[in-house]
From Swiss-Prot:
This is UDP-N-acetylglucosamine--N-acetylmuramyl-(pentapeptide) pyrophosphoryl-undecaprenol N-acetylglucosamine transferase. It catalyses: di-trans,octa-cis-undecaprenyl diphospho-N-acetyl-alpha-D-muramoyl-L-alanyl-D-glutamyl-meso-2,6-diaminopimeloyl-D-alanyl-D-alanine + UDP-N-acetyl-alpha-D-glucosamine = di-trans,octa-cis-undecaprenyl diphospho-[N-acetyl-alpha-D-glucosaminyl-(1->4)]-N-acetyl-alpha-D-muramoyl-L-alanyl-D-glutamyl-meso-2,6-diaminopimeloyl-D-alanyl-D-alanine + UDP + H(+). It is a peripheral membrane protein. GO terms for biological process: carbohydrate metabolic process; cell division; cell wall organization; lipid glycosylation; peptidoglycan biosynthetic process; regulation of cell shape. InterPro entries: GlcNAc_MurG, Glyco_trans_28_C, GlycoTrans_28_N. GO terms for cellular component: plasma membrane. One of its GO terms (molecular function) is undecaprenyldiphospho-muramoylpentapeptide beta-N-acetylglucosaminyltransferase activity. Cell wall formation. Catalyzes the transfer of a GlcNAc subunit on undecaprenyl-pyrophosphoryl-MurNAc-pentapeptide (lipid intermediate I) to form undecaprenyl-pyrophosphoryl-MurNAc-(pentapeptide)GlcNAc (lipid intermediate II). Transmembrane segments: none annotated. Keywords: Cell cycle, Cell division, Cell membrane, Cell shape, Cell wall biogenesis/degradation, Glycosyltransferase, Membrane, Peptidoglycan synthesis, Transferase. Its EC number is 2.4.1.227. Pathway: Cell wall biogenesis; peptidoglycan biosynthesis. UDP-N-acetyl-alpha-D-glucosamine binds at T10, G11, G12, N113, S174, Q275.
Length: 343
């Protein structure tokens, strides 16, 4: 085995690892994902599932599973004998990175967010290289920290300006998605009728909320398409005139590289407040607006949507401003580093 990728937890950690695994395979190298139960199965990517669940609720059970996962990871890594372990942060990467450290296997870390996460911070001194997704990453200082970019499979494409219907793409992410299903949908359905008639909503929606949200849009006379997950995000972004999203690092990278204007609503309970720092980096570019999830969110979001959806030139200006943002797809550059490390 050439490379083990340590990931899991949320899509922000998982999807960059999957993108990198596919790129590694195209270069003729072998890799496997070590992740938790949330990762799911990807037929074209090898994976090994650790029996971890998200921390919360029964903490004693979580720590028992964490210890068990560390033992399993140590056994599997010793058996596979990889030349390199790449960690993507998050609690689910801890057992695999610990095994690599114990077995003296070279470690590279990839940090998706604008603030170094707790697991990556823990293994900072053990890593040979820390690849960052933002030009400036809080707590990631020193010569071994290199701005590489995030790993996404998105390319900028222009959409037809002749379309009279504006597509609003809503990406809830895996954290705090109920808020988008309840609050954001409600705000859109209470916009002035002249705006509701000229928009089409494409929304990532929790399965349990699907009927409720669909009924809400139907009652508000808003054309909608709902899905629990979009596996063609590149196409969805191409069709979008405006994106409403959490401020996860991978979402920001995809939206920015697709050259789309956005409204970011940072998840207020994100670890180390990383979504706030991600959004802080973006907000001064003129390509996006940040709305805080607080008691004023409905009023602020309503005012913003009325202004943006009523001004197509403003949306085009915001899209052009994405070019100013130093967000890049780092797959090619990172692969060169990995190949050099493998010798």
């Amino acid at each position: 085995m050439d490379i083990v990728l340590a990931t899991g937890g949320t899509g922000g950690h998982i999807f960059p690892a999957i993108t990198l695994a596919r790129a590694i395979k195209r270069q003729g190298y072998d890799s496997i994902l070590f992740a938790d139960k949330k990762t799911g199965k990807n037929t074209d990517v090898k994976d090994y599932t650790l029996p971890l669940n998200k921390p919360g609720g029964n903490k004693f059970r979580f720590f028992l599973l964490l210890i068990y996962s560390c033992v399993l990871a140590l056994y599997q890594i010793r058996k596979l004998k990889p030349k390199l372990v790449i960690g993507f942060g998050g609690y689910a990467s801890f057992p695999t990175l610990l095994a690599a450290k114990v077995l003296s296997i070279p470690i590279i870390l990839h940090e998706q967010n604008a603030v170094l996460g707790r697991v990556n911070k823990f293994f900072f001194n053990s890593a040979e290289l820390i690849a960052t997704s933002f030009p400036e990453t809080k707590y990631a200082k020193g010569n071994k920290c290199v701005f590489i970019g995030n790993f996404v499979d998105i390319k900028a494409k222009s959409h037809s300006s002749t379309k009279k219907i504006l597509t609003v793409l809503i990406i809830a992410g895996s954290q705090g998605a109920n808020f988008f299903d309840d609050v954001v949908s409600s705000v859109i359905c209470n916009l002035p009728i002249e705006i509701r008639k000229k928009i089409r909503v494409v929304q990532q929606c929790m399965k349990k909320n699907m009927n409720k949200v669909e009924g809400l849009y139907k009652g508000g006379q808003v054309i909608c398409e709902l899905s629990e997950f979009f596996d063609d995000m590149g196409s969805r972004l191409t069709d979008a005139h405006l994106v409403i999203s959490r401020a996860g690092a991978t979402s920001i990278a995809e939206i920015t590289l697709a050259r789309r204007p956005a409204i970011y609503i940072p998840y207020p309970c994100s670890k180390d407040d990383h979504q706030f720092y991600n959004a802080e980096y973006i907000k001064d570019s003129g390509a996006a607006v940040v709305v805080e999830q607080n008691s004023e969110v409905k009023k602020n979001l309503t005012k913003l949507l009325v202004n943006l959806l009523g001004d197509s030139q403003k949306l085009r200006d915001m899209a052009n401003n994405t070019k100013k943002i130093r967000i890049k797809n780092g797959v090619t550059e990172f692969i060169r580093i990995v190949i050099h490390k493998l010798g």
